[in-house]
């Protein structure tokens, strides 16, 4: 038998049953699940300093446990001196067991380390049950060594679910233990 992350086991054993009874689904297959988690980091100064972009890719890889890819500008923005196709950020798309491990680490280890943390905004859903929020400092993750980073920068986390609406999405993430402030 292979390794199953604790959150995945908790989802299959408990959360599905709770969601089916709460939303009166006819089948357990209707219960929403987390499809993927996208962690991204924009590096605006990468135009001037390529080392910052490599540092961002390395840090995202350390945080998530999966290799990050560089993202390119979709269009030119003269005000920011950005040309189309220029590398300006990094992202990681997590699925499967790595996704559940990252979510556990985020909810139980990283978010409680945020100074004056009172929960994440519960209204940041997109209308389709997907949830996005920002983290101001990457140093809340224990994998990042404060002495070795180029600069403190934030990152964005998007949790994509199969929920049909925001109410189902919020219920799903709440049962996983996401600390919503409202």
Swiss-Prot record:
Gene3D superfamilies: 3.30.1440.10. SUPFAM superfamilies: RL5-like. Keywords: Ribonucleoprotein, Ribosomal protein, RNA-binding, rRNA-binding, tRNA-binding. NCBIfam families: PRK00010.1. This is one of the proteins that bind and probably mediate the attachment of the 5S RNA into the large ribosomal subunit, where it forms part of the central protuberance. In the 70S ribosome it contacts protein S13 of the 30S subunit (bridge B1b), connecting the 2 subunits; this bridge is implicated in subunit movement. Contacts the P site tRNA; the 5S rRNA and some of its associated proteins might help stabilize positioning of ribosome-bound tRNAs. Part of the 50S ribosomal subunit; part of the 5S rRNA/L5/L18/L25 subcomplex. Contacts the 5S rRNA and the P site tRNA. Forms a bridge to the 30S subunit in the 70S ribosome. This is Large ribosomal subunit protein uL5. It comes from Borrelia turicatae (strain 91E135).
